[in-house]
Amino acid sequence: MLKTMRRHGITLALFAAGATGLTAVVNSLTENTIAHQAALQQKALLDQVVPAENYDNDMQAECYVVTDSALGNMAPHRLYLARKGNQPVAAAIETTAPDGYSGAIQLLVGADFHGNVLGSRVIEHHETPGLGDKIDIRISDWINHFSGQHVTGDDDKRWAVKKDGGSFDQFTGATITPRAVVRAVKNAALYLQTLPPQLSRLPSCGEDQ
């Protein structure tokens, strides 16, 4: 009887150890797959705001943390540096439009260091479906209108919605949202013009984690 119980106990222990090991292996493989997919999605997003022909480095590996009120608030925002021939040429930077109709709007803006916008995407918002949500690339191509635009300075009158005398369309029944996004993209592009002297002093994203 005792031998039988001992044998069953050993069997159960071996089974438990095997199950635990298998679970650990599955979890490890799953985590690696999820991380890989997340990296691919991030790379695709970066390429939408800084087209791949503009750089030859690994932008994801050159992630830095910036904090400046020009980015909508004093929260840390991430910046991904683009290089060509080892020279900094542009960046993709997170920024916030704090004055959206339904709250803050989070964006990723790509621009060079001379005021030329390369691309922009809304990455988080709570705008009203059918009205303010046209800022989302999945709903309309309105956000693409910033690509190729140049910002000359803070007093550049073109950087406003048409209702305010600027160059960008507002939405029918929704002016607050596009106005907020136009301002945020403009401010991000202006901020990037000031960035090159600071690059060597920026903390990396790894240091921020």
Swiss-Prot record:
Q: How does it assemble?
A: The complex is composed of six subunits: RnfA, RnfB, RnfC, RnfD, RnfE and RnfG.
Where does the sequence pass through the membrane?
Answer: 9-29
Which gene is transcribed and translated to give this protein? Answer: rnfG
Q: What is its EC number?
A: 7.-.-.-
Q: Which residues form a coiled coil?
A: none
Give the sites modified to FMN phosphoryl threonine: 175
Matches recorded under HAMAP family: RsxG_RnfG
**Function of the molecule:** Part of a membrane-bound complex that couples electron transfer with translocation of ions across the membrane.
Q: What is its main location?
A: membrane
Recorded source organism is Yersinia pestis
Instruction: Name the enzyme group at the top EC level.
Output: translocase
Show the SMART domains listed in the entry.
Answer: FMN_bind
Record-given protein name = Ion-translocating oxidoreductase complex subunit G
List keywords of the entry alphabetically. Cell inner membrane, Cell membrane, Electron transport, Flavoprotein, FMN, Membrane, Phosphoprotein, Translocase, Transmembrane, Transmembrane helix, Transport
Q: Which NCBIfam families match?
A: PRK01908.1 (NF002519), rnfG (TIGR01947)
